[in-house]
From Swiss-Prot:
Family (UniProt): Belongs to the eukaryotic ribosomal protein eL42 family.
Disordered as annotated region, ranges: 23-61
GO molecular function: structural constituent of ribosome
Family annotation (InterPro entries): Ribosomal_eL44, Ribosomal_LSU_eL42, Ribosomal_zn-bd
Species, as recorded: Caenorhabditis elegans
Cellular component terms (Gene Ontology): cytosolic large ribosomal subunit
Superkingdom, natural source: Eukaryota
Protein name: Large ribosomal subunit protein eL42
UniProt record, GO biological process: translation
Length: 105
């Protein structure tokens, strides 16, 4: 289990160019646009008769995703992303583990 604090003091690539406090959140994929070129092409190909026209991917190999931290500078609001290792359980701003404590999911 990976537990990451909600705030981190790290270097700001933006206007600051120095170590500042950053607000940490987890990156989430945005909603896909209906008007991207690939989506338009796919929709056009799918319309009409003829069933499924492109292969549906079924051979999933990975059981986890890499966690991406999105850090926002508290001074200049510049945002940067930091990928960390793969993990099954990710927690943002959870309790710190004390000695001899059992992990609860």
């Amino acid at each position: 289990m990976v537990n990451v604090p909600k705030a981190r003091r790290t270097f700001c690539d933006g206007k600051c160019r120095k170590h500042t406090n950053h607000k940490v959140t987890q990156y989430k994929k945005g909603k896909e646009s209906k008007f991207a070129q690939g989506r338009r092409r796919y929709d056009r190909k799918q319309s009409g008769f003829g069933g499924q026209t492109k292969p549906i991917f079924r051979k999933k190999a990975k059981t986890t995703k890499k966690i991406v931290l999105r850090m926002e500078c508290t001074e200049c609001k510049h945002k940067k992303q930091l990928p960390i290792k793969r993990c099954k359980h990710f927690e943002l701003g959870g309790q710190k583990k004390s000695r001899g404590q059992v992990i609860q999911f």
